[in-house]
Amino acid sequence: MEAERLNAIQNTLADLKSRADDLRRYLDYDVKSERLVEVDKELENPEVWNDPKRAQELGREKKSLETVVLALTKLDEDLTGAAELFELAREEGDDETIEAIEADTAGMRAIVEDMEFRRMFSGPMDAANCFIDIQAGAGGTEACDWASMLLRQYLKYCERKGFKTEVLEESEGDVAGIKSASIKVEGEYAFGFLRTETGVHRLVRKSPFDSAGGRHTSFSSIFVYPEVDDSIEIEVNPADLRVDTYRASGAGGQHINKTDSAVRITHIPTGIVVQCQNDRSQHRNRAEAMTMLKSRLYEHELRKRQAAADAQEAAKTDVGWGHQIRSYVLDQSRIKDLRTNVEISNTQKVLDGDLDPFIQASLKQGV
């Protein structure tokens, strides 16, 4: 095997080892390793299960710690082993082994790049589960159909990422599509991945609802907010709430069950409205709606404190030209993020949930 190729493999392994060592420092590998041992010992104590809430918190912490510790441990072992094997194979002129190591470096590079990407999740709630609210805006029936396309897009994206999803509320459009929907997303860094999707999404296409085949523009808004767990105290005065019950009006099928026990809660001081209709039990729907409300109130307060409420709340209330984050021009095969200038021509792939190019660019640019 030529010397240039051998040197390239050696340099790649050295570069990956250096980046992995940097990750161990950035991600506090030593501290997390020690804490993982402590958590394991605590979970091995039978008395911890007398306090289910504490046991649950420890279980979540263990899972989070293992994600970093086990991945970095294996990466270090793989890189060290590959470097040692490479030197032996090079001395013996074993081209077959060297080619296998060269192939393995691609997988190790992908792991390093993924962990470097996850370093961008520095927000206090990035690791949390989240909710996605979808609201049809300007454009009538076309906008309702667009909202249903976005619902499908995000469900497909979450499926690709291995996230668990549940459609909590889905209101049908008068002719087609949906007026609104709320999704709960459960998975590691669900909010971190999805938070930059908040904003208005614009669709331009030849409308299937126009017999003349005219080109139509419509809008739908996306609002993503983290689920607040019991460790964060959110006080809600019952006097500030209006609770309405109604018959579910969703599209049915695989997403949602028709019930007579849907719940809508309005927080009067802020005007925040949450709805849940996925369960046949009114009690469970109300409990889920309260979780959504507390999460919304937490996010609302955070945005106020960070002086970012203007842009975010405008995106919720003014679903029109002025607050777009992404433009989907289907008849020109072009989807463009207006914040990062990332542009994709394979529109169907994006609508089928391949949002990673947009999300990664927005996180890297600190959108």
UniProtKB/Swiss-Prot annotation:
<feature type="modified residue" description="N5-methylglutamine">
    <location>
        <position position="254"/>
    </location>
</feature>
<dbReference type="InterPro" id="IPR045853">
    <property type="entry name" value="Pep_chain_release_fac_I_sf"/>
</dbReference>
<keyword id="KW-0488">Methylation</keyword>
<comment type="similarity">
    <text>Belongs to the prokaryotic/mitochondrial release factor family.</text>
</comment>
<protein>
    <recommendedName>
        <fullName>Peptide chain release factor 2</fullName>
    </recommendedName>
</protein>
<dbReference type="GO" id="GO:0016149">
    <property type="term" value="F:translation release factor activity, codon specific"/>
</dbReference>
<dbReference type="InterPro" id="IPR004374">
    <property type="entry name" value="PrfB"/>
</dbReference>
<dbReference type="InterPro" id="IPR005139">
    <property type="entry name" value="PCRF"/>
</dbReference>
<dbReference type="InterPro" id="IPR000352">
    <property type="entry name" value="Pep_chain_release_fac_I"/>
</dbReference>
<dbReference type="Pfam" id="PF03462">
    <property type="entry name" value="PCRF"/>
</dbReference>
<keyword id="KW-0963">Cytoplasm</keyword>
<dbReference type="GO" id="GO:0005737">
    <property type="term" value="C:cytoplasm"/>
</dbReference>
<keyword id="KW-0648">Protein biosynthesis</keyword>
<dbReference type="Pfam" id="PF00472">
    <property type="entry name" value="RF-1"/>
</dbReference>
<comment type="function">
    <text>Peptide chain release factor 2 directs the termination of translation in response to the peptide chain termination codons UGA and UAA.</text>
</comment>
